Swiss-Prot record:
Cellular component aspect of the GO annotation: cytosolic small ribosomal subunit
Naturally occurring in which organism (per UniProt): Koribacter versatilis (strain Ellin345)
Alphabetical list of InterPro entries matching this protein: Ribosomal_uS15, Ribosomal_uS15_bac-type, uS15_NS1_RNA-bd_sf
Record carries keyword NAD: no
Quaternary structure, from the entry: Part of the 30S ribosomal subunit. Forms a bridge to the 50S subunit in the 70S ribosome, contacting the 23S rRNA.
Family annotation (SMART domains): Ribosomal_S15 (SM01387)
Similarity comment: family membership: Belongs to the universal ribosomal protein uS15 family.
SUPFAM superfamilies listed in its UniProt record: S15/NS1 RNA-binding domain
Domain of life: Bacteria
GO terms, molecular function: rRNA binding; structural constituent of ribosome
GO biological process: translation
Keyword entries, A-Z: Ribonucleoprotein, Ribosomal protein, RNA-binding, rRNA-binding
Entry protein name: Small ribosomal subunit protein uS15
Amino acid sequence: MLAREHKTNIIEQYKTHANDTGSPEVQIAILSTRITELTDHFKAHKKDHASRRGLLMMVSKRRSLLDYLKKYDTERYKSVIQKLGIRK
């Protein structure tokens, strides 16, 4: 789980306007951070299958947000991909 301060920092980095908390960029960045944390968790806890299911759901949600962004605003999509270092 992300700490409140860490989540706030991510929102500050990726927001598109002053009160932005739900734009696709912010959601993708938060999901990417959670995915990275869970990936590290699985290195130590290989048999944690319940959390693995959660990880797969997060990856799927991030993929759909990326697809949405790619469909409606390709420039923002490319920017997010580059900032986060996600494969296409």
